[in-house]
Structure formats: C-alpha cells, structure tokens
Amino acid sequence: MFKNVFSSLQKVGKSLMLPVSVLPIAGILLGIGSAHFTLIPEIISQIMAQTGGSIFSNMPLIFAIGVALGFSNNDGVAALAAVVAYSILIQTLSAVELNILNTDANTIKNKNFSDIGILGGIIAGAISAYMFNKFYKIQLPEYLGFFAGKRFVPIISGLFAIFVGLILSLIWPSIGNKIQIFSEWAAYQNPIIAFSLYGLVERALVPFGLHHIWNVPFQMQIGEYKNSIGQIFHGDIARYMAGDTTAGNLSGGFIFKMYGLPGAALAIWHTAKKENRKKIGSIMISAALTAFLTGITEPIEFSFILVAPILYIIHAILAGLSFPLCIFLNMRAGTSFSHGFIDFIVLSGHSHKIFLFPIVGICYGLLYYSIFYFLITTFNLKTPGREENKNTVFFRNNIEIAPYIVEALGGKNNIKNLDACITRLRITVSEISKVNEENLKNLGAAGVVISGSGVQAVFGTRSENIKTAIDEYINNI
C-alpha cells in the first residue's frame, strides 16, 4: 500500500513541475516591471508588471492543466477538460453562496468564498484526469456517437465539477478559514519557525522527488498582497515580485544553494583519492557551478545522499537553518524558480541588504566545507573518488547513451512509462527485478531511487534531453 501511495505522490510531484516551469518568465516580467528601473521606460515597466501579474493570477488554472496532463500521459483533451472543470467549479461555488446560502455579494467578494486558489486548480485537474482515464474509450448509442470517446471527457468533467463545487461550497468556508489562519501564521506571525520547517522538510523530500508538493503552499499560497491597480497576489514568490515588503522569506535558499553546497562539493573533491582527484574535481566543479548559477543542486546532493546519508541529514538541517537566518538578518531576495545567481541578479529590484548575501553565503560555504571534510575523513565515508574504482562510461551526447539506459532499465518492453523533470528521469517499469541500478550509475546517474515499480535516475539538467533521446530510440527499434 505504501509503495502505491508513494508512486501516486511521485506522479503528483511530476505533474506540478509543468505549471512551476512558467514561473521564470512570470517572475522576470513581474519582478523587473515592478522594480521600475530608471533605464526602462515606465510604459514598458507597466506592461511587464501587468503581463507577469496576469500569469500569477491564472496560476490555479495553469495548475489544473498541469495536473491533468501529468495524470493523463500528456493528452490535450484532459487539459481542455481541466479548463472546463475549473471554470465550472469556481462558478458553482459563487452561485451556491449567492443564490442558495443567500450570502451577500459583497461578503462573498470580500471573503473570497470562490477563491480556493491553487487547491482549486489541483482539484479540477484531478477531476479531469480521472474522468479522462475512465471514459476516454467510452462507447455511446449511435445517435450520440459524436460525443463518444475523448469528446465525452470535457462533458462529464464539467458535470462532475458541479457536484464537487456543491460539496465544496458547504465545507470550504471552514477549510478556507483554517488555511487562512496557517497562511497568516507562516507569512506574518512566525515566519522564522514556519520557514525553518519548510527548509528542513523540503530538503528531506528531495531524494524521493516529492519536494514539489511541499513547495506549493509556501511558494504559491501563503500570504496576500494587493498592488496599486487592485491585483491580488498569493504566495511568497508572487508577493515578493509584486513589491510586498513582508515577502522574501524564501531567501535562505540562496545561501545553501549558491554557497553551502558548492562548499560541500569542494570538500568531496579535496577528500577524493589522489588518483581520482582530477576526475572528481571536474565533476564537482561542474555541479557546483550549476548550483551557483541556477540553484539546481541534485547533482551534488545525490553524490553523497546514498553513500553517506549522515551528510545529507546534516545538509537538510543546515538548509533549514538558512531560512530563519536570512529572516533574522532581514535579508530579502526574490526567486522565480530556483535560488541561483541568475535569479539573484535579475530579480534584485526589490532586494534588501543584498550586500549581506555573499558575506553570509561565503561563511556558510566554509561551514559546509569544514563539516563535510571532517566527517568524510574522520569516518572514511565513501563519497565520490573514495570508493573502489568504478567503470563509469562517458558518452559525448544523449543519443549515444539512450540505448544503454534502455538496456539498464530492462529493455524496451519493460518500460511502461517514461518522463523527466528538471534533474531526473522518472520511469515506471513492468518488472523491477530487470532494472540494473549499478549500470544506471555507471552510465552517469548521480543517484537512483527505486520504489515499487517506479525508478528515478538523476542525470542532472540533461534529463529532459536524455528522455527525448530515449523516446526517439524506442520509436525507431
């Protein structure tokens, strides 16, 4: 049962990656536009701010589409059904409150009864995905034949959304109130504790690929801010971009991603065996540069997470502590996607005490380096370059590596589903016993996570391109 739940949660995490992928463009537009840089004409700033804000305003709908695609093998009909389901769900909530419960229209507007945010989008996406998987092959009488098959999915999704909306209209005020209480606590009353917990749990979930689920409420939901033209923004990311001076509580990510983990990578390089130091150095420097520039840290983390779990536990604790440290020092910087140098510079318009980030960051990097170096050498941890020699095979391009990955996964017929997120391949296989974990690592995977029939292989930022190469290879054999 646990494996089935875990597999489902992995699908949820994967499906949330598509809507999250629009955050960079939304963040850049809103962040730069709201900063009103003197070099940019005011009319251009206003256009950028409003277009970026419109993306954030429509994030619930974007999440609905993303969830629907994630659970329907990227079928466009499910995405269309999600749009229908979300629209009907929201309007049902408003109609019930106004016409059945006789709630005053101004009260509905002020208390946002129909604004169930990202959760509403996820619910609508789940409805459409479920209906797609259940009814996309349905057969109807000949006189209704036009509506058979996939055309039936938007219809049944919309009808079911009315039913769900009726139920939510009765229970949402209570649920929404509790969510609002948590939101107020996390964003305004005690952000130090809230974001300490956020950072610790977020890193703890990375090995399982479930951290995207945990990110959503903090990044996209907590807090509320209304700008000068009446646009309302939720979540720490959008509020910061829009100019909310109480946002920016996610700033701690810059400390451990840009400085802390590169310090750990340096320690792994320096503690490698002398004969392996050159090879490990090139790998770790590349991974550290990726983390510094883009905030993508899995290539470093998976280099020690499986061989030295104690290092990852300490890393998760240090990552969690970086958030309250920045809040305590009143350091604020914005992120649109991940905490890297690109975000740090591009979104610096609303930053506060920006000069402290490299100072605190370098200190954090030295702390990481010292702890990792001490533990690796004292307890002889088998981090990269300290283990027995491995026959790692290096390939010049993704087309060359694709056949070997398919073979390591048990062959074409053993692969039931193949997908990729930012840093890892996500595969569902028929027989897990046919998967050769060691070969996947020898092919360059920084780590391999197996649970039930699910396999995750961490190939870093190459993962999406490798997935495309594997798809092309499978289609041609």
UniProtKB/Swiss-Prot annotation:
Residue span, PTS EIIC type-1 domain: 1-388
Keyword presence, Plastid: no
InterPro entries membership: Glu_permease_IIB, PTrfase_EIIB_Cys, PTS_EIIC, PTS_EIIC_1, PTS_Glucose_EIICBA, PTS_IIB_1, PTS_IIBC_glc
GO cellular component, one term: plasma membrane
Record-listed Phosphocysteine modification sites: 421
Membrane topology: Multi-pass membrane protein
Catalysed reaction equations from the record: N(pros)-phospho-L-histidyl-[protein] + D-glucose(out) = D-glucose 6-phosphate(in) + L-histidyl-[protein]
EC id: 2.7.1.199
UniProt keywords, alphabetically: Cell inner membrane, Cell membrane, Kinase, Membrane, Phosphoprotein, Phosphotransferase system, Sugar transport, Transferase, Transmembrane, Transmembrane helix, Transport
Record: active site: 421 (phosphocysteine intermediate)
Matches recorded under Gene3D superfamilies: Glucose permease domain IIB
Residue stretches spanning the membrane: 20-40, 51-71, 76-96, 112-132, 152-172, 250-270, 280-300, 304-324, 354-374
Any GO molecular function: D-glucose transmembrane transporter activity
Subcellular location: Cell inner membrane
Record flagged with keyword Metal-binding: no
Pfam families reported for this sequence: PTS_EIIB (PF00367), PTS_EIIC (PF02378)
Function of the molecule: The phosphoenolpyruvate-dependent sugar phosphotransferase system (sugar PTS), a major carbohydrate active transport system, catalyzes the phosphorylation of incoming sugar substrates concomitantly with their translocation across the cell membrane. The enzyme II complex composed of PtsG and Crr is involved in glucose transport.
Annotated domain remarks: The EIIB domain is phosphorylated by phospho-EIIA on a cysteinyl or histidyl residue, depending on the transported sugar. Then, it transfers the phosphoryl group to the sugar substrate concomitantly with the sugar uptake processed by the EIIC domain.
Protein name per its UniProtKB record: PTS system glucose-specific EIICB component
Source taxonomy: Bacteria, Pseudomonadati, Pseudomonadota, Gammaproteobacteria, Enterobacterales
Gene from which this protein is expressed: ptsG
